[in-house]
Amino acid sequence: MTAKRIDGKAFAAGVRAQVADHVARLKADHGLVPGLAVVLVGEDPASQVYVGAKGKQTVEVGMASFEHRLSAETSEAELLALIDRLNRDPLVHGILVQLPLPPHLNSDLVINALDPAKDVDGFHISNVGRLGTGQKSMVPCTPLGCLMMLRDHLGNLSGLNAVVVGRSNIVGKPMAQLLLGESCTVTIAHSRTKDLAAVCRGADILVAAVGRPEMITGEFIKPGATVIDVGINRIERDGKTKLVGDVDFASAAEVAGAITPVPGGVGPMTIACLLANTLTACCRANGLPEPQGLTA
């Protein structure tokens, strides 16, 4: 068996096209332009690149992009004052604070200062709680992207056995909540799970988000299962730096029914879902119907 390759890059392009279409209609019918504000503190190179990509794609779908680049010495009071202004700005529908923040800033305090309705990363404690209790919320972008791809590939997920390897607040826990919301039977596993391979082999859906390069091999996978690899790891191989996932793609692809590659799988969906969340936030703020197929 050779697994179907789930092309996240192409899927993300489709999501962005849907977002752009909805944005154009919002402008034409209601005179509204969804606005996304991104706050970057410091000069972390990876964050600089990521923020640049977010801004570019925001403009490409017709949204307004507001970038706030602050020095690494910015005080907590200054950052909170900026967030307060963005919370009250009617042109801003989504706010994203790029993590990690410099060590002198309290990330939890900063994230929870956001208006939950504008928290397009879905990290505010209110959104976390609402997701966990099955209420309407802003959903973290990476798990939302995974869910979109699973729905597209498998259709109805009800009754399927799902194993999420990883228990982070950013991916593992919200991914499990989303799968529960689809009526899957969900197991959360992690690096200390006893006989992890046996647990994973029970999964119709296997989501790897443990942060260990190529930890999940073909021996962990039930024949025909759908494997979503969230991992992004840089390793040295043959004298070169290579980007790999948490899944050993070569061995897994011989067993799985479908699998996301790294790169080109889950990664592109994260920014696409950020744009989708910003669109959703704009619609909610203005009492308009939410876009179908772009939310959980």
Curated annotation (Swiss-Prot):
Sites where the protein binds NADP(+): 166-168, 191, 232
Record keyword Amino-acid biosynthesis present: yes
Top-level taxon of the source organism: Bacteria
Example GO biological process: tetrahydrofolate interconversion
A single cellular component GO annotation: cytosol
Alphabetical list of Pfam families matching this protein: THF_DHG_CYH (PF00763), THF_DHG_CYH_C (PF02882)
Alphabetic keyword roster: Amino-acid biosynthesis, Histidine biosynthesis, Hydrolase, Methionine biosynthesis, Multifunctional enzyme, NADP, One-carbon metabolism, Oxidoreductase, Purine biosynthesis
GO molecular function terms noted in the UniProt entry: methenyltetrahydrofolate cyclohydrolase activity; methylenetetrahydrofolate dehydrogenase (NADP+) activity
Enzyme Commission number: 1.5.1.5, 3.5.4.9
Pathway it works in: One-carbon metabolism; tetrahydrofolate interconversion
Subunit structure: Homodimer.
Function, in words: Catalyzes the oxidation of 5,10-methylenetetrahydrofolate to 5,10-methenyltetrahydrofolate and then the hydrolysis of 5,10-methenyltetrahydrofolate to 10-formyltetrahydrofolate.
PANTHER family tied to this protein: C-1-TETRAHYDROFOLATE SYNTHASE, CYTOPLASMIC (PTHR48099:SF5), C-1-TETRAHYDROFOLATE SYNTHASE, CYTOPLASMIC-RELATED (PTHR48099)
UniProt family annotation: Belongs to the tetrahydrofolate dehydrogenase/cyclohydrolase family.
UniProt name for this protein: Bifunctional protein FolD
Organism the protein comes from: Cereibacter sphaeroides (strain ATCC 17025 / ATH 2.4.3) (Rhodobacter sphaeroides)
Lineage: Bacteria, Pseudomonadati, Pseudomonadota, Alphaproteobacteria, Rhodobacterales
Gene: folD
